[in-house]
């Protein structure tokens, strides 16, 4: 196997890699324990934005029950070349909250259509408090 190197990515490069959106994985602690779910996402105004079902399992798990309190999550995006054993990953950590009020309309227009069937009108935003990334490539 060829020699490979791991490169730490800075915030700007990490955001550049995920700027086109796509599929990411939200990780959080649900009422059943650690949970990781794939979602279609958009990078909007420096934050991760995705849609889910109002009162669905993800919505219920992300509610703290305390007005104004945010739920801390992780969000991972990657692009892997299995044949070449190379790729990159970006990890975003920060609070997740529902998008409501006047900002909802613009955010909703910017958000990608979910692949999952059903009505998914609730917008969730993850505001990055920490962004890290790594790339594995040939040396």
Give names to the regions the model predicted.
Residues 107-139:
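Short, active-site-adjacent segments that bind or coordinate small-molecule cofactors and metal centers
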Residues 36, 49, 74, 91, ...:
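Conserved hydrophobic/aromatic beta-strand scaffold that supports enzyme active sites
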Residues 39, 52, 77-79, 128:
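Residues immediately flanking
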Residues 21-54:
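Short beta-strand segments
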Residues 55-112, 120-121:
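Short, structured beta-strand-loop surface elements
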Residues 3-25:
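Short, basic/aromatic recognition patches
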Residues 50-52, 75, 133:
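Short hydrophobic/aromatic-rich beta-strand segments that constitute the beta-sheet cores
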